[in-house]
Every structure is written in C-alpha cells, then in structure tokens.
Amino acid sequence: MSGSIRDILEEKLARFEKLENDMSDPEVLSDGARMSATAREHGGLNRLANQYRTFKRLTDEIHQCVAMVADAEDVDEREMAESEMESLRKERETVWEDLLSLTVGGEDSHRTRCVMEIRAGTGGDEAALFARDLFEMYTRYAEKVGWKTELMDASPTEMGGFKDVTLTLEGDNVFRDLQYESGGHRVQRVPETETQGRVHTSAATVAVMPEPEDVEIDLKPDDYRKDFFGASGPGGQHVNKTDSAVRLTHHETGIVVQCQDEKSQHKNLAKALRVLKARIYEKKREEEAAKQAEARKGLIGSGDRSQRIRTYNFPQNRLTDHRINLTIYKLDQIIAGDLNPVTEALIEYDRDQLRGDMID
C-alpha cells in the first residue's frame, strides 16, 4: 500500500478510536451538541475503521501463513498452510476493494454533509440559466439517492436563473460522490432568446466543500465582522423592509459569505456561519492538499475549481467529462438527475489509480 493511502487509513482509524473514547467522556456526554457531532462523525467512519481493522488482521494472518510455509516439515503441513494463505488473500482482496471505495475521496470521504456553491460564469443570462440547471440537476439527484438538501443563499435573475446559489447536502457518501463536481462546467446550446438557431457557449463554476463539525472549527464572534442589510430579489429590487440579510467577513482569511434566503435575521446568521465554517475548512484543506500534491497527483478528486472539467452539449445530447475522456449521449437523463453513470465512472477511475497499492 502506498504511503499516502496507508497514512489516510491510519489517520482515519486513529480519529475513529479517539471518537470512541470521546463518546464515553463525561464532558462530551454532558454537551448535547458536541455529543451529537461526535456521534455523527463516528458513524461516518464506522465502516471504514472496522474494514481497515479486518484488513490489518488478515495481513497479519497471511504473514503467519508465509512463516508456516517456510517452516513446514512435510508436504501436507506446507499445503495446508498454502491453502489457508490463499483463502486469506482472497478475503483480504474483497476487504481491500471495499476500502478503496471508502477512501477514494481522500481524508474527507466519510463526510456526510457538504456545502455546494454554483456561480454563473461567462455568458450573461444564459450562464445564469445554466447555473439554475446545474442546481436543479444536483437537487434531483439528491432526491433520487435519498440525500437531504437545504438552500442557503441565492441571487436569482429576472429570467429565472441564478448569478450564484449555495446549498447544503446531507447523506451517506455525499462528499465522496459530489467532490468530483468541483470545477468549471461549460454548456453548448441554443438559448431560448436566440432567433437564428445559433449554438452559444457559456459557463458556470461549482465548488463542493465538506461541512466540518462545530467542534472542528472554533469560530468566535471576534473572528468575523457581521453586516446586516435588506434582502433583494431578481434584478436587485428590495424585497424585505427589515435588515434580515447577513454578510460575514472572516478577519484572518478575508473570506466573505452572505445569506438572505430566510426572512429571519437569526436564521440567516446561522446559515451564513455554517457556510463560513465550510469555507474556512476548505481553505485549510487546500493548503494541506498543496503539501500532498505529489502523493495525490494521479487522482482526479482534488477539486481544482480553475479546471474545466465538463461540457454539456445539448444539440448532441452529449456530456463529456474531460478529466477521464468520458462521453455519454444521455445528457437529457443526466440533467434530469440521473448523475450515477458520471459519478460512478469518476470514482472507479480514482479507485483504479489506487488498486495496486496493497500491502503484501
């Protein structure tokens, strides 16, 4: 097993064991919010930790069989040890495949909550409509696989698109599967306003960030500035007479987030804090990823937002993912929420990059 994958597995097992200890700590037990966050993260790591423990046990038993074969005093004893070793290796290969599925997304693949930001790029109104289409594609996909979604903030346009929209998603494997969506998305189609039937190209960017638990990002009120203002609707018109919209500016990083989706200032503040924590955590992840770039350079789950990852060609009903040269002529189904063929191909690609790195 390569050092990077072994390190990820060891770190996750150590984290799981710490969470196990924390769940019996009186201080944690007395804090409902902390206990809930600890139990949620523990549950997300449970399968991986147990499978890795099984993998390590099987590896030890294989080593024992190797020694038994070497020390065998007769043919029967050696054949028995070889047969046992072959059985253990087959069992370990099955466990290893499962571990690959669980670790292919990196150290945050176990996260059950994430924040997604979709922003219109070049292309004016058509780009904003494409951003809306992406938003609807992801929410339909979430509904199909049983994830919960929550709208955090949106800047709608008069034509029904989005300049930008932020949502959270929660469920099993949510970050592992959606992290591959980070990057530049390009659309080629004939806009509704196009009278001569010409195909236009426009773009949007998607950023997917794991949502950290409250105990992981210690954010104090002095760490950020709060600004309150009136919420606005399509075209910028004022839609709220009270200053219910919230803008937060993190002093250390300069990160700015805002939320105006709720009528309540308190609810908007709570949502904005969740997004801010995710953005801060993502910045830390990016800094750590830069240090580990060499170890993970062959994987595509790094989420480089500057990278153009995908083209949606409506006249040809074609989706192309440029990272793995994947082309699917079922764009209508994918836009309707059937994202599985794309997601599974991306995960399998990364899994293949790791498949040969098993411990002997």
From Swiss-Prot:
Localization in the cell: Cytoplasm
Post-translational modification: Methylated by PrmC. Methylation increases the termination efficiency of RF1.
Pfam families reported for this sequence: PCRF, RF-1
SMART domains reported for this sequence: PCRF
Residue(s) carrying N5-methylglutamine: Q237
Disulfide bonds, paired cysteine numbers: none
Gene Ontology terms, MF aspect: translation release factor activity, codon specific
Listed SUPFAM superfamilies: Release factor
InterPro entries: PCRF, Pep_chain_release_fac_I, Pep_chain_release_fac_I_sf, Prokaryotic/Mito_RF, RF-1
Domain of life: Bacteria
Keywords carried by this UniProt record: Cytoplasm, Methylation, Protein biosynthesis
Role: Peptide chain release factor 1 directs the termination of translation in response to the peptide chain termination codons UAG and UAA.
Similarity annotation: Belongs to the prokaryotic/mitochondrial release factor family.
Name of protein: Peptide chain release factor 1
Organism: Rhodopirellula baltica (strain DSM 10527 / NCIMB 13988 / SH1)
Gene this chain is encoded by: prfA
